[in-house]
């Protein structure tokens, strides 16, 4: 499936039974479809307070993102998702959310030094 960075997708998460879960594509668009996997961050609607909230940006449901509930981007659970496990693109994140996601990824990956 053709996906772009910032797309919110429904995907089958490894090790979890049940329905597909939402996640955000964080892989660079320049990689195109040359890989069999796509780097993603899963979302959770079980929004919790954490010690470093910058690490789990919150997204409110909006017309363009396809979400039905307030959700957290779990940057600390980023993983390479097989392309064949991505079921659909349901929306995309806005610029503000992209900026907050980028900041969280810089910290998680140790690049914000």
Task: Indicate where each model-derived feature is located.
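Conserved functional hotspots at enzyme active or ligand-binding sites that engage polyanionic ligands
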Residues: 1-113
């Amino acid at each position: 499936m053709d996906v772009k960075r910032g797309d919110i997708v429904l995907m089958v998460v490894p090790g979890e039974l049940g329905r597909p879960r939402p996640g955000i594509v964080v892989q660079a668009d320049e990689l195109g479809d040359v890989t069999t996997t796509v780097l993603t961050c899963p979302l959770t609607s079980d929004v919790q307070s954490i010690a470093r909230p910058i690490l789990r940006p919150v997204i409110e449901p909006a017309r363009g993102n396809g979400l039905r509930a307030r959700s957290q981007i779990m940057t600390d659970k980023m993983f390479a998702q097989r392309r064949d496990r991505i079921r659909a693109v349901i929306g995309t994140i806005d610029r503000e959310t992209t900026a907050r996601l980028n900041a969280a990824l810089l910290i998680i990956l140790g690049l914000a030094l």
